[in-house]
Curated annotation (Swiss-Prot):
EC number: 2.3.1.275
Residue ranges crossing the lipid bilayer per the database entry: 3-23, 54-74, 81-101, 122-142, 158-178
UniProt pathway: Lipid metabolism; phospholipid metabolism
GO biological process: phospholipid biosynthetic process
GO molecular function ontology, one term from the record: acyl-phosphate glycerol-3-phosphate acyltransferase activity
Keyword tags: Cell membrane, Lipid biosynthesis, Lipid metabolism, Membrane, Phospholipid biosynthesis, Phospholipid metabolism, Transferase, Transmembrane, Transmembrane helix
Record's subunit section: Probably interacts with PlsX.
UniProt-recorded name of the protein: Glycerol-3-phosphate acyltransferase
Protein backbone atom coordinates (compact mmCIF):
# COMPACT_ATOMS: atom_id res chain seq x y z
CA UNK A 1 0.00 0.00 0.00
CA UNK A 2 2.85 2.36 0.80
CA UNK A 3 4.39 1.74 -2.63
CA UNK A 4 1.11 2.32 -4.45
CA UNK A 5 0.36 5.45 -2.43
CA UNK A 6 3.75 6.97 -3.16
CA UNK A 7 3.50 6.12 -6.86
CA UNK A 8 0.20 8.01 -6.93
CA UNK A 9 1.93 10.94 -5.22
CA UNK A 10 4.69 10.80 -7.86
CA UNK A 11 2.07 10.88 -10.62
CA UNK A 12 0.24 13.81 -9.00
CA UNK A 13 3.50 15.73 -8.60
CA UNK A 14 4.26 15.22 -12.26
CA UNK A 15 0.72 16.17 -13.21
CA UNK A 16 1.04 19.70 -11.82
CA UNK A 17 0.74 21.93 -14.94
CA UNK A 18 3.21 24.59 -13.87
CA UNK A 19 3.06 26.46 -17.17
CA UNK A 20 -0.71 26.75 -17.01
CA UNK A 21 -0.82 27.78 -13.35
CA UNK A 22 2.01 30.30 -13.61
CA UNK A 23 0.46 31.82 -16.73
CA UNK A 24 -2.98 32.16 -15.19
CA UNK A 25 -1.82 33.29 -11.74
CA UNK A 26 0.71 35.94 -12.75
CA UNK A 27 0.02 36.82 -16.39
CA UNK A 28 -3.72 36.16 -16.76
CA UNK A 29 -2.80 34.07 -19.79
CA UNK A 30 -3.63 30.48 -20.63
CA UNK A 31 -0.56 29.32 -22.54
CA UNK A 32 -2.60 26.45 -23.98
CA UNK A 33 -4.33 29.10 -26.06
CA UNK A 34 -1.14 30.83 -27.22
CA UNK A 35 2.00 29.98 -29.15
CA UNK A 36 2.28 26.26 -29.78
CA UNK A 37 -0.30 25.52 -27.10
CA UNK A 38 2.18 23.39 -25.16
CA UNK A 39 2.35 23.81 -21.38
CA UNK A 40 6.12 23.36 -21.10
CA UNK A 41 9.15 25.57 -20.77
CA UNK A 42 9.69 26.53 -24.40
CA UNK A 43 6.15 27.74 -25.04
CA UNK A 44 6.07 29.51 -21.68
CA UNK A 45 9.32 31.26 -22.61
CA UNK A 46 7.93 32.19 -26.01
CA UNK A 47 4.56 33.46 -24.74
CA UNK A 48 5.29 34.83 -21.27
CA UNK A 49 8.99 35.70 -21.47
CA UNK A 50 12.30 34.38 -20.14
CA UNK A 51 11.55 34.85 -16.43
CA UNK A 52 8.33 32.87 -16.57
CA UNK A 53 9.96 30.29 -18.83
CA UNK A 54 12.85 29.83 -16.40
CA UNK A 55 10.50 29.50 -13.42
CA UNK A 56 8.42 26.86 -15.19
CA UNK A 57 11.56 24.97 -16.23
CA UNK A 58 12.85 24.92 -12.64
CA UNK A 59 9.46 23.81 -11.30
CA UNK A 60 9.12 21.07 -13.92
CA UNK A 61 12.62 19.80 -13.17
CA UNK A 62 11.91 19.98 -9.43
CA UNK A 63 8.74 17.89 -9.61
CA UNK A 64 10.65 15.18 -11.48
CA UNK A 65 13.42 15.23 -8.89
CA UNK A 66 11.11 15.22 -5.87
CA UNK A 67 9.10 12.32 -7.27
CA UNK A 68 12.27 10.35 -7.99
CA UNK A 69 13.52 10.88 -4.44
CA UNK A 70 10.29 9.65 -2.80
CA UNK A 71 11.38 6.00 -2.41
CA UNK A 72 14.68 7.11 -0.90
CA UNK A 73 13.06 9.47 1.60
CA UNK A 74 10.36 6.94 2.58
CA UNK A 75 12.59 3.84 2.37
CA UNK A 76 10.65 2.01 -0.33
CA UNK A 77 12.25 -0.79 -2.33
CA UNK A 78 11.08 -2.85 -5.30
CA UNK A 79 12.59 -5.63 -7.39
CA UNK A 80 14.42 -2.86 -9.28
CA UNK A 81 16.68 -2.35 -6.26
CA UNK A 82 18.74 0.83 -6.52
CA UNK A 83 16.90 1.71 -9.73
CA UNK A 84 13.57 2.00 -7.86
CA UNK A 85 13.74 5.84 -7.99
CA UNK A 86 13.54 5.60 -11.80
CA UNK A 87 10.13 3.96 -11.49
CA UNK A 88 8.89 6.91 -9.46
CA UNK A 89 10.44 9.32 -11.92
CA UNK A 90 8.57 7.59 -14.74
CA UNK A 91 5.29 8.08 -12.90
CA UNK A 92 6.09 11.80 -12.65
CA UNK A 93 6.80 11.88 -16.39
CA UNK A 94 3.50 10.08 -16.97
CA UNK A 95 1.74 12.69 -14.86
CA UNK A 96 3.37 15.50 -16.79
CA UNK A 97 2.33 14.12 -20.17
CA UNK A 98 -1.11 12.79 -19.18
CA UNK A 99 -2.11 15.23 -16.45
CA UNK A 100 -5.28 14.75 -14.43
CA UNK A 101 -5.24 18.53 -13.93
CA UNK A 102 -5.16 19.23 -17.69
CA UNK A 103 -7.85 16.93 -19.08
CA UNK A 104 -5.25 14.16 -19.38
CA UNK A 105 -3.12 16.18 -21.73
CA UNK A 106 0.31 17.63 -20.95
CA UNK A 107 3.80 18.58 -21.97
CA UNK A 108 6.58 16.86 -23.88
CA UNK A 109 8.36 15.36 -20.85
CA UNK A 110 11.75 17.02 -21.34
CA UNK A 111 12.18 19.03 -18.12
CA UNK A 112 10.47 16.47 -15.87
CA UNK A 113 12.66 13.71 -17.31
CA UNK A 114 15.68 15.93 -16.66
CA UNK A 115 14.56 16.24 -13.05
CA UNK A 116 14.39 12.46 -12.77
CA UNK A 117 17.95 12.22 -14.10
CA UNK A 118 19.13 14.94 -11.70
CA UNK A 119 17.89 13.00 -8.69
CA UNK A 120 19.07 9.61 -9.95
CA UNK A 121 22.49 10.53 -11.38
CA UNK A 122 23.53 14.18 -10.86
CA UNK A 123 26.80 13.75 -12.76
CA UNK A 124 25.04 12.47 -15.86
CA UNK A 125 22.52 15.31 -15.50
CA UNK A 126 25.34 17.86 -15.56
CA UNK A 127 26.84 16.20 -18.66
CA UNK A 128 23.47 16.13 -20.42
CA UNK A 129 22.67 19.71 -19.41
CA UNK A 130 26.03 20.84 -20.76
CA UNK A 131 25.31 19.17 -24.10
CA UNK A 132 21.81 20.66 -24.15
CA UNK A 133 22.99 24.21 -23.49
CA UNK A 134 25.77 23.87 -26.09
CA UNK A 135 23.32 22.54 -28.66
CA UNK A 136 20.91 25.40 -28.01
CA UNK A 137 23.76 27.85 -28.53
CA UNK A 138 24.78 26.24 -31.84
CA UNK A 139 21.29 25.58 -33.22
CA UNK A 140 19.04 28.05 -31.35
CA UNK A 141 16.38 25.32 -31.57
CA UNK A 142 15.27 23.96 -28.21
CA UNK A 143 13.34 21.02 -29.64
CA UNK A 144 16.35 19.81 -31.65
CA UNK A 145 18.69 20.25 -28.68
CA UNK A 146 16.30 18.27 -26.47
CA UNK A 147 15.99 15.35 -28.88
CA UNK A 148 19.76 15.13 -29.37
CA UNK A 149 20.37 15.41 -25.61
CA UNK A 150 18.00 12.51 -24.89
CA UNK A 151 19.78 10.40 -27.49
CA UNK A 152 23.13 11.21 -25.87
CA UNK A 153 21.81 10.27 -22.42
CA UNK A 154 20.83 6.87 -23.78
CA UNK A 155 24.27 6.34 -25.32
CA UNK A 156 26.15 7.56 -22.23
CA UNK A 157 24.13 5.34 -19.88
CA UNK A 158 24.85 2.43 -22.24
CA UNK A 159 28.59 3.15 -22.07
CA UNK A 160 28.43 3.19 -18.26
CA UNK A 161 26.40 -0.05 -18.35
CA UNK A 162 23.52 1.27 -16.30
CA UNK A 163 21.02 -1.04 -17.92
CA UNK A 164 17.93 0.24 -16.12
CA UNK A 165 18.72 3.83 -17.02
CA UNK A 166 19.60 2.80 -20.58
CA UNK A 167 16.24 1.10 -21.03
CA UNK A 168 14.27 3.98 -19.56
CA UNK A 169 16.31 6.58 -21.43
CA UNK A 170 15.69 4.71 -24.68
CA UNK A 171 11.94 4.60 -24.06
CA UNK A 172 11.89 8.29 -23.15
CA UNK A 173 13.99 9.17 -26.20
CA UNK A 174 11.50 7.45 -28.49
CA UNK A 175 8.64 9.14 -26.64
CA UNK A 176 10.27 12.58 -26.85
CA UNK A 177 10.84 12.15 -30.58
CA UNK A 178 7.19 11.14 -30.95
CA UNK A 179 5.98 14.17 -28.98
CA UNK A 180 8.18 16.40 -31.14
CA UNK A 181 7.04 14.97 -34.48
CA UNK A 182 5.50 18.31 -35.57
CA UNK A 183 8.74 20.04 -34.56
CA UNK A 184 10.72 17.55 -36.65
CA UNK A 185 8.59 18.41 -39.66
CA UNK A 186 9.19 22.14 -39.14
CA UNK A 187 12.94 21.55 -38.66
CA UNK A 188 13.04 19.77 -42.01
CA UNK A 189 11.17 22.68 -43.60
CA UNK A 190 13.44 25.25 -41.95
CA UNK A 191 10.50 26.90 -40.19
CA UNK A 192 11.00 25.74 -36.60
CA UNK A 193 10.91 28.53 -34.02
CA UNK A 194 14.25 29.64 -32.61
CA UNK A 195 15.23 31.26 -29.36
CA UNK A 196 16.44 34.84 -30.00
CA UNK A 197 20.11 34.08 -29.38
CA UNK A 198 22.84 31.70 -30.47
CA UNK A 199 24.55 30.95 -33.74
CA UNK A 200 21.55 29.38 -35.42
CA UNK A 201 19.42 32.44 -34.75
CA UNK A 202 22.07 34.81 -36.07
CA UNK A 203 22.57 32.67 -39.18
CA UNK A 204 18.86 32.85 -39.92
CA UNK A 205 18.81 36.61 -39.30
CA UNK A 206 21.74 37.09 -41.68
CA UNK A 207 19.90 35.49 -44.59
Amino acid sequence: MKLIGLLIVAYLLGAIPNGVWVGKAFFQTDIRQAGSGNIGTTNTYRVLGPYAGTIVMVLDIAKGSVATLLPIVFHVQTVLGTATPLLFGLFAVLGHTVSIFDHFKGGKAVATSAGMLLAYNPIMFVIAAGFWVSLIYWTSIVSLASMIAFTLITLISLVFQDWYLTGIALVLTVFVFYRHRSNIQRIRQGTESMVPFGRGYHRRQAK
